[in-house]
Swiss-Prot record:
Listed PANTHER family: DIGERANYLGERANYLGLYCEROPHOSPHOLIPID REDUCTASE, GERANYLGERANYL DIPHOSPHATE REDUCTASE
Database matches in Gene3D superfamilies: D-Amino Acid Oxidase, subunit A, domain 2 (3.30.9.10), FAD/NAD(P)-binding domain (3.50.50.60)
Comment on bound cofactor: Binds 1 FAD per subunit.
Cofactor(s) required, per the database record: FAD
NCBIfam families xrefs: GG-red-SF
Extra remark beyond the main annotation: Reduction reaction proceeds via syn addition of hydrogen for double bonds.
Residues holding a 2,3-bis-O-(geranylgeranyl)-sn-glycerol 1-phospholipid: 327, 363
Protein name per Swiss-Prot or TrEMBL: Digeranylgeranylglycerophospholipid reductase
Keywords assigned: FAD, Flavoprotein, Lipid biosynthesis, Lipid metabolism, Oxidoreductase, Phospholipid biosynthesis, Phospholipid metabolism
Organism: Pyrococcus furiosus (strain ATCC 43587 / DSM 3638 / JCM 8422 / Vc1)
Binding-site list for FAD: 13, 32, 43-44, 46, 95, 119, 274, 286
Length: 393
């Protein structure tokens, strides 16, 4: 069988590529190795509300658990900073439904969709990549394609088979552990984030409300830590007297927080999303970045097919680095600075930060925030804090 494009992986990036290319009239096959697209989830499920309009996704209550109005962060000593809007700023998704619906939208646009289909090798003829070999419901199939998209996650098989260098050292990954559980006592209109070296080394604990008394409660820490993410999460729950006898779901995962893939295309294979390490280095969220990259990639796939010139595919790398690269590099720089903070530093900065500051930091636009902080006596008194901030400018 033959297709113009085979997209491997049906998270958030893959279906958007498949949908947009199919809309342009080209034949597309979207495959995913899981028998049920969207499971298991490996995500806190929070996303900015603007993505629906930006990426032409229906605002469908079937996959929206809760609308969110802001965020509250907590320092090691209990100081807080809050960002609260008068209108909805984000939503907590039901990823099992959301991912499946993205695949549905791709199918409605004209793409074929196969679940329980695992790519095991690339199809090569005379040294050229001509498609993929896959196990589809247990049977070996060969699928020819002009372009192959590796959207198959952090351990991308397709990228490795194509020879795309996705290597990153262990330090560039976070280990995440999450409970979906019954929990009370936290404002369900906000997401909640706790920082501290004893709480979550290099990361944070989160509570993302899915209902009035149900939330994703998780943690991300450096993956090369000698203790596990589960250890730190259970410790935090115990210290905060939060019962752990009403756990509805457990999810674990490895999150890339650096090591961006430099060359996103090799021959006729393009890598996108977690497979390309396109994840916000500060908070570890990858849905928006995956969608943005998928949007750019789909545009260049369509142009390459329309003009019958696969060399145009390389413009995906160029455009992503021009549009998203500078922001991602700034966020990585911010993360490196955050890694040097002591708990006392975190206490000081949380006390000094306002809601507008939090918004700028989350978006990577931290220059104004840093300059303002550097003038504060509590920062000027500390040579180390001053040096950390100076390194960001």
């Amino acid at each position: 069988m033959k297709y113009d494009v085979v997209v491997v992986g049906s998270g958030v990036a893959g279906p958007i590529v498949a949908r947009d290319v199919a809309k342009a009239g080209f034949s597309v096959l979207l495959v995913d190795k899981k028998p049920a697209i969207g499971t298991p989830k490996q995500c806190a499920e929070g996303i900015n509300v603007n993505v629906f309009k930006e990426f032409d996704i229906p605002y469908d209550k079937r996959f929206i658990n809760r609308e969110i109005y802001g965020a509250r962060i907590y320092s090691p000593s209990g100081y807080t900073a809050e960002l609260r809007y008068d209108k909805v700023s984000g939503v907590i998704l039901e990823r099992k439904v959301f991912d499946k619906m993205l695949a549905y939208y791709a199918a409605k646009a004209g793409a074929d969709v196969w679940a329980r289909t695992e790519v095991i090798d690339l199809l090569r003829k005379e040294g050229k990549i001509m498609g993929v070999k896959a196990k589809h419901e247990g049977e070996l199939v060969e699928i020819e394609a002009k372009i192959i998209v590796a959207a198959d996650g952090v351990e991308s098989t397709v990228a490795r088979l194509a020879g795309i260098n996705t290597y990153a050292p262990p330090h560039e990954f976070d280990s995440a552990y999450e409970y979906e559980m019954i929990i009370e006592g936290y404002d369900p209109d906000l997401i909640h984030l706790w920082f501290g070296n004893e709480i979550a080394p290099r990361g944070y604990v989160w509570v993302f409300p899915k209902d009035e008394d149900r939330a994703n409660v998780g943690i991300g820490i450096n993956s090369d830590n000698e203790k596990t993410a589960k250890y730190y999460l259970d410790k935090w729950l115990k210290e905060n007297n939060i019962p752990t006898k009403k756990i509805l779901e457990i999810n674990v995962g490895l999150v890339p927080v650096g090591g961006f893939v430099r060359e996103l295309v090799k021959e006729n294979v393009a890598v996108v999303g977690d497979a390309a390490r396109q994840v916000n280095p500060v908070h570890g969220g990858g849905m928006y970045e995956a969608m943005k990259a998928a949007n750019i990639l789909a545009k260049w796939i369509v142009k390459a097919l329309e003009e019958e010139n696969l060399e145009l595919l390389k413009n995906y790398t160029k455009e992503w680095w021009e549009v998203e690269g500078p922001k991602m590099e700034r966020l990585l720089k911010l993360r490196r600075a955050m890694e040097k903070l002591t708990d006392e530093d975190i206490d000081v900065f949380v006390q000094l930060l306002g809601g507008t500051d939090l918004e700028k930091l989350a978006g990577g636009n931290y220059f104004e925030v840093v300059k303002a902080l550097m003038k504060h006596p509590k920062v000027l008194m500390s040579k180390r804090r001053l040096e950390i901030l100076k390194a960001l400018l």
